[in-house]
């Protein structure tokens, strides 16, 4: 099968760090056929500088009218996602959209309904499902090394005492740290544990740099109630803009062990430094950041447990190419669905909305199905 003719909408960091490198790394699967670049001229174009043969459009309607384009990758600010995704679907294009998907649950639901009615793929770029640290924690939980998990704490922290001034810092729908990083951490949580019963959150401007209504710090707790054969579970997802030094990534506690991991997945920094996803060292974590495990054997006297065995766990190599391979498989097989299911995207939207309500009201918000 010929490579899927792909158009990329957007010329910012996300397009050139999180999308173009993987399209380039998979030439048998995708062709970078077109780009939407509003300020391009006949002599100056960011997309053409990276891909000399790319067809550059300055008008979106003209790009969407190109019948050769099969897949549209949307790498634009979230406040325009609803409009642009709608246009692409109505033009008969399959769509891969950056996260955060839309500012509201209602808009997200409308778009998935539209894609279904037109028998088109619509998926959201939750690439951090393929972070090495997450894959390592996921495997550790699923193989039972920790027993039953009762607390799962996940962080992505930064030390940034200023606002960068991009879409994430402007008081528009879909802005702020919860939509930016929280959408990833919540997606990872529901991938592991499903739908929580309720949400308790605190969102704030930690740095007190205007606009103060755009949060730069959050702590969101997803509550899972005890059920028959299952203990209660709290999933805590956090991010801070004032965190200096080696940052904690995961603390996971279970009935048979604990998992502690420092350091963030290296892929973003590697891509920023110009490393190709084809490089043998791509996605490989530093041994200094390997997780520490404390585990107990399966059959113990709970009244007199032995001292836990401490060990170091090598990080599974992360690889965002896997998401693009899923996209290719979905289009080739005509299933039009990746592992990021529509109901999961909608659940993330619902949890984010509940987190804002919880923080504003200082109460827990039940999460109805």
Curated annotation (Swiss-Prot):
Keywords: Oxidoreductase. Its EC number is 1.-.-.-. One of its GO terms (cellular component) is nucleus. InterPro entries: Gfo/Idh/MocA-like_OxRdtase_C (IPR004104), Gfo/Idh/MocA-like_OxRdtase_N (IPR000683), Gfo/Idh/MocA_oxidoreduct (IPR051317), NAD(P)-bd_dom_sf (IPR036291). GO terms for molecular function: kinase inhibitor activity; nucleotide binding; oxidoreductase activity, acting on NAD(P)H. GO terms for biological process: NADH regeneration; negative regulation of transcription by RNA polymerase II. It is an enzyme of class 1 (oxidoreductase). The keyword Cytoplasm does not apply. Pfam families: GFO_IDH_MocA, GFO_IDH_MocA_C. It comes from the Eukaryota. Belongs to the Gfo/Idh/MocA family. This is Uncharacterized oxidoreductase C26H5.09c. It comes from Schizosaccharomyces pombe (strain 972 / ATCC 24843).
């Amino acid at each position: 099968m010929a490579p899927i003719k792909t158009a990329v909408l957007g010329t910012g960091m996300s397009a050139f760090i999180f999308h173009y490198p993987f399209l380039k790394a998979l030439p048998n699967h995708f062709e970078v056929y077109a780009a939407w670049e509003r300020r391009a001229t006949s002599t100056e174009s960011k997309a053409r500088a990276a891909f000399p043969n790319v067809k550059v459009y300055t008008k979106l309607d003209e790009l969407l009218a190109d019948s050769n384009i099969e897949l549209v990758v949307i790498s634009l600010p979230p406040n325009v996602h609803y409009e642009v995704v709608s246009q692409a679907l109505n033009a008969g294009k399959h769509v891969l959209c950056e996260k955060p998907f839309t500012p509201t649950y209602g808009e997200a639901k409308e778009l998935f309904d539209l894609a279904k009615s037109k028998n088109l793929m619509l998926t959201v770029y939750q690439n951090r499902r393929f972070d090495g640290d997450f894959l390592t924690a996921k495997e550790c939980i699923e193989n039972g090394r920790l027993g039953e998990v009762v607390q799962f704490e996940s962080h992505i922290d930064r030390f940034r005492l200023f606002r960068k001034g991009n879409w994430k810092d402007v008081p528009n729908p879909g802005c702020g740290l919860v939509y930016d990083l929280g959408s990833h951490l919540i997606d990872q949580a529901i991938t592991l544990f499903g739908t929580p019963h309720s949400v308790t959150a605190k969102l704030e401007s930690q740095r007190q740099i205007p606009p103060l209504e755009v949060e730069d710090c959050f702590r969101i707790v997803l509550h899972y109630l005890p059920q028959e054969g299952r203990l209660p579970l709290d999933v805590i997802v956090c991010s801070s803009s004032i965190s200096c030094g080696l940052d904690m990534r995961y603390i996971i506690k279970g009935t048979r062990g604990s998992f502690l991991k420092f350091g963030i997945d290296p892929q973003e920094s590697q891509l920023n430094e110009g490393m190709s996803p084809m490089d043998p060292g791509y996605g490989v974590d530093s041994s200094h950041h390997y997780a520490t495990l404390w585990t107990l054997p399966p059959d113990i006297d709970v009244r007199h447990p032995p001292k836990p065995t401490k060990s170091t766990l090598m990080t599974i190599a992360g690889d965002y190419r896997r998401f693009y391979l899923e996209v290719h498989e979905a289009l080739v097989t005509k299933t039009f669905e990746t592992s990021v299911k529509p109901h999961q995207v909608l659940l993330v939207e619902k949890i984010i909305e509940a987190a804002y309500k919880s923080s504003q009201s200082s109460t827990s918000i039940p999460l109805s199905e």
